[in-house]
A protein has these predicted regions:
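Nucleotide phosphate-binding/pyrophosphate-handling subdomain across enzymes
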Residues: 30-134
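Phosphate-binding loop of NTP-binding sites
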Residues: 12, 179, 197, 208-217
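C-terminal helical cap/extension that packs against the catalytic core
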Residues: 125-184
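Short, solvent-exposed loop/turn segments at secondary-structure boundaries
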Residues: 199-202
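Short, charged/polar "capping" segments at the starts of alpha-helices
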Residues: 6-9, 120-121, 144-149
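Short beta-strands and strand-loop turn motifs
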Residues: 188-192
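Extended acidic/charged loop-beta regions that coordinate divalent cations
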Residues: 1-32, 68, 72-75, 79, ...
């Protein structure tokens, strides 16, 4: 498959959709906008899957699945869309590299909830990623100060870009992230840290986040 060019035989992207070209000719299978999961890698995952099942699974079934599948739990999992704001649970992101990967999935600046147990790892590489991909950073836990310092010391940082808020508790962090959201915003829990300062594991942390988000009205 190819995202860059049309193929005589295979799966490719054309005019914002995934197409298949085979012995029956070329046809549009899935608009990229119809994929619920964010990120180029998910487009490529669907391309590979479509190539494997083309001719075996009807195209309308593929479209229905793509529009409904929210992803694997705690891995950039779409929790809810409320008043045009999308909330994602990426609690498995317990290191800067995982959070970086999550941020790069979105084509817009996001509202990020980060921080947690201090594993004594550097956040230098995360700072520039937050400057590039985050509009508001909400910090909690023992690593809040370290992450803040990494962001404020990153190239391109200017006061208020992103806005940085430190909170006293996980619940306060989620509330602050949700405050003043507008339709089209993305709020993501992607801590870049382990959960042991407050939770038994990343799953418990992710479930706590989801409970709070589902309780919003």
């Amino acid at each position: 498959f190819s995202r860059k060019r049309e193929l005589e035989r295979g799966v490719y992207v054309k005019d914002g959709s995934i197409w298949v070209s085979d012995e029956r000719g070329a046809r549009e299978v899935l608009p990229i906008g119809g994929i619920l999961l964010p990120g180029v890698h998910n487009v490529e995952n669907y391309m590979a899957a479509i190539g494997a099942v083309s001719g075996l699974v009807p195209d309308d079934v593929i479209r229905e699945f793509a529009a409904a599948f929210k992803g694997v739990e705690h891995r950039i999992e779409l929790v809810r869309t409320l008043r045009g704001v999308r909330y994602y649970n990426d609690s498995i992101a317990s290191s800067p590299s995982r959070t970086t990967a999550g941020l790069r999935c979105f084509d817009q600046p996001v509202i990020l909830i980060a921080g947690g147990y201090d594993k004594h790892i550097p956040f230098d590489t995360l700072g520039p990623e937050i400057v590039s991909h985050v509009k508001k950073l909400v910090l909690t836990g023992p690593t809040a100060g370290k992450i803040r310092a990494a962001v404020e010391g990153a190239p391109g940082y200017a006061p208020g870009r992103p806005e940085i808020v430190e909170t006293d508790s996980f619940e306060d962090a989620v509330a602050e992230a949700n405050r003043e959201t507008v339709p089209g915003d993305v709020v993501i829990l992607s801590p870049a840290c382990a959960s042991f300062d407050r939770f038994k594991n990343f799953m418990e942390r992710g479930n706590a986040f989801k409970e709070i988000i589902h309780a919003l009205d």
